[in-house]
Amino acid sequence: MTNQALVVGASGIVGSALSRLLADEGWKVAGLARRPNTDAGVTPISAVLLDPKALAAALTGVSPTHIFLTTWARQASEAENIRVNAQMVRNLLEAVRPAGAVRHVALVTGLKHYLGPFEAYGKGALPQTPFREEQGRLDVENFYYAQEDELFAAAERDGFSWSVHRPHTVTGVAVGNAMNMATTLAVYASICRHTGRPFRFPGSDVQWHSLTDMTDAGQLARHLRWAASTPAAANQAFNVVNGDVFRWKWMWSRIAEWFGIDAAPLDGPAPLEQQMAGDADI
């Protein structure tokens, strides 16, 4: 049987990398996004996940065997994050029910599973590190948990297997997608080089000195494909990172060197929203 993938969020960093990988490996790939993915081998589908009727209409005739949920929508509060993002997962999994072909659904979440939502990110007592997949949930409301609950309920109802993938900060190539730390830092460094401004670290003292890691979109795509096609990986959660642990105080000077500029010493908070407030014309 030919594997038919439905990649939700196909124009994003993760979704576009995954769509290309699956198409290259001979999968039939449908890419769902508000801004359709036009890569070779990907059938574009334009739909809004919060509109159940329009979503069902857009998916008419699509019979996915494997679904990859790689998108989310940030809202003004965690309560809204929970409501909106849970509804997006619920609507999608309801829309594919009539086809009756789904065998596996993969959900991409992330580090906030362990550190808490935006409103409480990294505050209070942190869980034991390194983070392990079997660690229990934090005692806070979290839209990642709401997404998981929708996935688990649908899997029990419809009989498909699932996997949850928890990357750290994801970097990769996605044309037109601004939610990409690599692109953001490249633009910021380029502006600093153009204007002669100091290349200041925009994060906190804790971030500067703490160990961290990242996830390459290609690495995550390969992991998603593996989990979706490996029976032993069914019904499990996975942390997915590159494995090269670093500190920003070490990395910052290396980014500066790449762009031919000097790295400024850490001198307190310097949010990019403030540093780049007047840079629209550059």
Descriptions of predicted regions:
Residues 158, 172-188, 218, 226-238, ...:
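Glycine/proline-rich active-site loop of Rossmann-fold NAD(P)-dependent oxidoreductases
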Residues 37-38, 46-91:
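NAD(P)H-binding glycine-rich loop region in Rossmannoid oxidoreductase-like domains
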Residues 134-168, 173:
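Active-site Tyr-X1-5-Lys
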Residues 187-215:
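A conserved pocket-lining segment of Rossmann-fold NAD(P)-dependent short-chain dehydrogenase/reductase
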Residues 67, 87-143:
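Conserved Rossmann-fold NAD(P)-dependent oxidoreductase catalytic core, especially the SDR/UDP-sugar
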Residues 3-25:
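N-terminal Rossmann NAD(P)H-binding glycine-rich loop of SDR-like oxidoreductase domains
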Residues 172, 203-211, 238-245, 256:
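Glycine-rich Rossmann NAD(P)(H)-binding loop
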Residues 221-282:
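Mid/C-terminal beta-alpha module of Rossmann-like enzyme folds, strongest
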